[in-house]
Amino acid sequence: MKALIYENYAQDDDFESILELRDILEPVPKPNDIIFRVKAAALNYDDIWGMRGKPLAVPLPHISGTDAAGEVIAIGNNVKNIKVGDRIVSHGNISCRVCTACTDGREYDCRQRKIWGFETGPLWGGYCEIAHLPEINVVKIPDNVSYEE
């Protein structure tokens, strides 16, 4: 599959000079993961920060894309609420799910929280043809809402 990868940080916001379209291996679902074909991906400030390498540096090489939507094409064995064919959008806060903040429903306060496509290392972001996330980090979108919306 194709992915937009960078191995260096942009100088003077020259993002074109660092981005390269490459072939990479398709993800395989872990028990709690969903795999989806990316239909739309947005550019937000986390992606810009990642490509700049500041204020926080992402691990390199890197695939950004903190916001993506698409169609589910595979699921892990433990996935319960998402099925192949569902239309989903990413929810990029990856948290531990076991600390007090997480169990109280405040995942945004998790001290181990990471942002998908920004600081999750091998859990690449959505600037690729096929992406993966834990089931808890996707939300179904209704048929009357486009992927771009």
Where are the regions a protein language model picked out?
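Cytochrome P450 core scaffold surrounding the K-helix E-X-X-R motif
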Residues: 45-52
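Short polar catalytic/cofactor-binding loops
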Residues: 7-12, 41-43
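C-terminal boundary of histidine-terminating zinc-finger modules
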Residues: 149
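Iron-sulfur (Fe-S) cluster-binding segments and ferredoxin-like electron-carrier domains
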Residues: 103-121
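Glycine-rich beta-strand-centered segment in the early N-terminal region that forms part
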Residues: 25-42, 54-103, 124, 132, ...
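Extreme N-terminal starter segment of soluble prokaryotic enzymes
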Residues: 1-2
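Short glycine/threonine/proline-enriched tight-turn/helix- or strand-capping micro-motif at secondary-structure
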Residues: 14-25
